[in-house]
């Protein structure tokens, strides 16, 4: 099923009993995090807190949480029937990322519908948009009226967590969508914590270099249709906008509205939109905050967004989440999006059989890759390829490469391969001074650290001078005989 806005998705989840309305008053200060964490760990439903309260004050906005708390709900949001169907989306992205010339007339004809569909999914602008039914400007702008979560006891302040941030570089037609957390530091001011390599930060840096004294327009969308939200966290090719990709997922063009104070465009049916500007040299110290690592992160300086106006629908819904020690919602998103990554990597490296990001590894810090090994050094080539091919894996610290007889998603098999097919000195690749997530306090320098590759494949001549072990396998005839006897054995 496809969803035109967040409310249609909520209605479908409720119909399938995958969403629970919480009528009991609950505070966004810590309580929602604890409830959401327990429900997510139990594989429970999305939550709609209908009576957010704090210190006796009742907010006018219900809070939607744990929306993508299971891989199945992520698949639903992307218009797929199940998680494995996400590989079809990955195959589409792999083709769009590196289209191949048709092998003949039939191949060209077969590819034509996809190309026509992509071209027809350019977003369209509408003049009247529900997201601008209500407008707060000037003194009316007050983030304190929104039930913004304060997630952990040691957090510095309330934190906007599901803000879909819209930016545009000075020489680009394409808008960038990214999800960056935002610390509230005033009634109309938030700190925009975007990492240096992310699209929003790159757009801002490029703009500031060309316009050192000009305020930079930014819009933040809080709550919109699931295809647009998930498009912002999917490895969309640079030739395709996230809005266009969302239309492809949804099967209909994304309807956009121009912001009231800039030429940026936002989803017309968004719940809440923050419009503002980043002024030159306006920076602030962000954090500390509990993060997806399970620890509080260090403080660092980031640009401040001054909010000029807040627009919204009638009876808007505030969409929120928390991050913490896995599993959390980003980890669950990683489990689902893992299936999108597999075909993209396989197109570049056909020898890859499977690729797995264990959620315990904070979604991206460790990858297990199985390959059909063909030559000495093959595992190392795959490691280097995974680190460099997609931006999403530039912060992956550990890559383990195994043979195709090992299930990458079974730790028992992976550990068996590591302990029987690896020599710690010969088969460990260490690289220093590589880009690392600045939240990784284990790195010696903020933003710069090491990577480790583990070659847990069977070794070939040229990689070892010893006779390699032969796996123990039971005789097929004996197995068939025992199968036939099994019911008589009483076991």
Curated annotation (Swiss-Prot):
UniProt-annotated location(s): Cell membrane
Binding locations of Mn(2+): 176, 242
Catalyzed reactions per annotation: a 4-hydroxy-3-(all-trans-polyprenyl)benzoate + H(+) = a 2-(all-trans-polyprenyl)phenol + CO2
Keyword terms: Cell membrane, Decarboxylase, Flavoprotein, FMN, Lyase, Manganese, Membrane, Metal-binding, Ubiquinone biosynthesis
Active site, renumbered: 291
GO cellular component: cytosol; plasma membrane
Residues reported in the UniProt entry to bind prenylated FMN: 179-181, 193-195, 198-199
Membrane topology (UniProt): Peripheral membrane protein
Record bears the keyword Flavoprotein: yes
Source organism, top-level taxon: Bacteria
Pfam families cross-referenced by the UniProt entry: UbiD, UbiD_C, UbiD_N
Enzyme class: lyase
Gene Ontology MF terms in the entry: 3-octaprenyl-4-hydroxybenzoate carboxy-lyase activity; metal ion binding
Pathway the protein contributes to: Cofactor biosynthesis; ubiquinone biosynthesis
Major site of localization recorded for this protein: membrane
Subunit structure: Homohexamer.
Family statement: Belongs to the UbiD family.
Protein name: 3-octaprenyl-4-hydroxybenzoate carboxy-lyase
